């Protein structure tokens, strides 16, 4: 899934706003009724999305606790956490990743790995461990890096990504993909 959240409806207080976590929760309910043996979440080629959704989705699979740490440019560290007690889905879980899994995908996969909650399979992820915002300009936009995020383990994914528990080769050449391939990346 992409880590989407209908920000406009959410901020307006619409109780039916759309989000990744709500959709995954509904699908998990259906799968549990079918008595599946386990669930595979495919984050290959997933560029990320909402940091809030990455945290909330993680919360479906862990029993409360930090999901990601965000260090702002002033040095302040904010801890984003699942504050809901209980695990929504307790069954076996695998997460598929590749070099094009980035940002919120890495936050989710990293948290699942740090909590020993899922088996991470595939290739090393993109290595985007930063948080950006887009500022509109008169003739375009400017993307600003505001913060760096860290996994629950304290590791940064910047330039190194998430290393899967079980790696397998990718069908494409990934040497030139990712933050580490950019000469001036932070």
Q: Which residues fall in each region the model found?
A:
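Short, small/polar residue-rich loop motifs at catalytic or cofactor-binding pockets
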Residues: 143-144
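Cleft-lining beta-strand/loop regions that shape enzyme active-site pockets
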Residues: 1-138, 148
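Acidic, S/T/G-rich, low-cysteine, solvent-exposed domains in lumenal/extracellular/periplasmic regions
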Residues: 136-140, 160-162
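Conserved functional hotspot residues or short segments at active or partner-binding sites
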Residues: 157-186
């Amino acid at each position: 899934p992409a880590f989407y959240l209908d920000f406009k409806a959410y901020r307006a207080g619409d109780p039916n706003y759309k989000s990744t976590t709500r959709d995954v929760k509904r699908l998990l309910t259906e799968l549990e009724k079918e008595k599946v043996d386990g669930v595979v979440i495919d984050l290959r080629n997933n560029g990320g999305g909402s940091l809030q959704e990455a945290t909330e989705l993680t919360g479906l699979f862990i029993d409360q606790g930090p999901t990601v740490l965000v260090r702002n440019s002033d040095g302040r560290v904010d801890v984003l956490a699942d504050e809901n007690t209980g695990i929504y889905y307790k069954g076996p879980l695998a997460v598929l990743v590749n070099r094009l899994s980035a940002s919120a995908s890495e936050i989710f996969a990293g948290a699942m790995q740090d909590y020993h909650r899922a088996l991470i399979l595939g290739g090393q992820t993109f290595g985007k461990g930063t948080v950006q915002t887009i500022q509109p300009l008169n003739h375009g936009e400017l993307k600003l890096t505001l913060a760096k995020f860290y996994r629950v383990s304290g590791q940064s994914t910047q330039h190194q990504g998430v290393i899967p528990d079980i790696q397998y080769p990718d069908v494409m050449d990934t040497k030139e993909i990712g933050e580490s391939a950019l000469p001036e990346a932070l």
